[in-house]
Amino acid sequence: MRVFITLSFISMLISCQVNYSFTGGQFSGAQNFSVNYLKPQTALASPAYCQQLTEGLKDYLLAQSPLKLVTQNGDLQYEGSIVEYSVVPIAAQGNEVASLSRLSITVKIKYTNQLEKELNFEKTFTKYADFPAGQDLFSVQADLWSAINDQLIQEIYNSSVGNW
C-alpha cells in the first residue's frame, strides 16, 4: 500500500507543470513571425527611420520570445506604416519663443495571428520625445529615434502578444 501511495504521489508531482514567462507573452502555439518593412506614409518620415523601427521590432521579438524570424507569411505577421512624423514647439518662454520642441511619431500596425484570428488587430501607436528648441533636430535625431522606438516597440509587443 505504501508503494502505491508513494508512486501516486510521485506521479502527481511529475505531471504538475507550471508555465511562467517573464515577458508575459502569449504566442498561441506560434512557431515564427514575420515583420514587413514599415513604409513611410508621410513626407517627413525618412526611409532610414522606417528601417530602424522595422529592425528594432524584429530584434525585440527575437529577444523576448521563443519565436523564429521568417521573411514572410509567419504565424504572427506585422505590417504597417509611419503615418505621422512631426516636430512642434511645446513650451513657450516669456518672450514667446519655444524652449522645447517635440518629435511625435505615429505608426499604424496591422497584426495578423494566423492561428487565432480573433487576436488580429489594426491599431495606431503614438509616442514622442522632447528636445531643447535651440538644438537642431538632426543633431539629436538618433537619440530621439531610439527613445521613441523603445516605447513604440514595447507597446506593439504588449498589444500583440503581451496580453496588455
Annotated model-derived regions:
Residues 1-16:
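Sec-dependent bacterial lipoprotein signal peptides
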Residues 9-10, 25-31, 79-82, 128-129:
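Short hydrophobic/aromatic-rich motifs at helix boundaries and adjacent loops
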Residues 14-59, 64-67, 71, 115, ...:
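A structural "domain/chain start" motif
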Residues 37-39, 125-129:
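Short, small-residue-rich loop/turn micro-motifs
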Residues 40-46, 135-143:
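Second-shell loop/turn segments in exported
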Residues 63-68, 75-120, 128-139, 150:
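Surface-exposed short loop/turn segments
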Residues 141-164:
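Compositionally biased, intrinsically disordered linkers/stalks adjacent to structured regions
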